[in-house]
From Swiss-Prot:
This is Protein TK0174. NCBIfam families: AmmeMemoSam_A, PRK00801.1, TIGR00296 family protein. Pfam families: AMMECR1. InterPro entries: AMMECR1, AMMECR1_dom_sf, AMMECR1_domain, AMMECR1_N, AmmeMemoSam_A, Uncharacterised_MJ0810. PANTHER family: AMME SYNDROME CANDIDATE GENE 1 PROTEIN (PTHR13016:SF0), AMMECR1 HOMOLOG (PTHR13016). Residues 7-201 form the AMMECR1 domain. The lineage of its organism: Archaea, Methanobacteriati, Methanobacteriota, Thermococci, Thermococcales.
Length: 205
């Protein structure tokens, strides 16, 4: 059962696109539209991903920022995440206006992270590639990978755990440490088929 209707997903992708374009072109932060569905004012976690169109998935990423926890209303979080993905992802220079025609927008609406319980060696059996995203925390370090990432890269569950450790700045086997907390979550993902094109729900498998 989907939490986010297809029309809401399209609304969020269009909103994220407009937020990016207005900020990149005019340094203007848009306001939530008056016709925002009531349900999208609920607090939810969300990530916005910008991808280069017609580029292999492993090379397509142009920016990805979001909020793992439901701390903002979804409509506001989507605007913030979209702008941050365009100009504040430390892995990339800010998006330039001439790039906008070549980028697709993807919005992932997250469920709250759930702690993976039990002994560390059993963690791979308690997550599933194609369903779960991961958040790993140890001390001051944390890292998150969305559910679509291991699918695009062809990882199994152990590699997914190792790569999330690496994303957190930790050794790849840190998921075997009892002091490392591993959380799983799911996401409903909506994407443009091509820049400014139709929006579809993205299947993971």
């Amino acid at each position: 059962m989907y939490r986010i209707k297809d029309e809401w997903g399209e609304f969020l992708v269009r909103l994220a696109r407009r937020a990016v374009e207005e900020y990149v072109r005019h340094k203007r932060v848009i306001e939530p539209p008056e016709d925002t569905p009531t349900e999208l004012w609920e607090k939810m976690g969300v990530f916005v991903t910008l991808n280069r169109h017609n580029v292999p998935p492993q090379m397509a990423l142009r920016g990805c920022i979001g909020f793992p926890l439901p701390i903002y209303p979804l409509v506001e979080a989507t605007i913030k995440a979209a702008i941050y993905a365009a100009v504040d992802d430390p892995r990339f220079p800010p998006v330039q206006p001439e790039e906008l025609d070549e980028l697709t927008v993807e919005v992932s609406v997250l469920t709250p992270p759930e702690l993976v319980e039990g002994p560390p060696e059993g963690r791979p059996k308690k997550i599933k590639v194609g369903r779960d995203g991961l958040l790993i925390e140890k001390g001051i370090y944390s890292g998150l990978l969305l559910p679509q990432v291991p699918v695009e890269w062809g990882w199994d569950e152990e590699e997914f755990l190792a790569q999330t450790c690496w994303k957190a700045g930790l050794p790849p086997d840190c998921w075997l440490d009892p002091d490392t907390k591993v959380y799983r979550f799911t996401a409903e993902i909506f994407e443009e088929e091509y820049p400014r094109g139709p929006v579809r729900r993205k299947p993971l498998v």
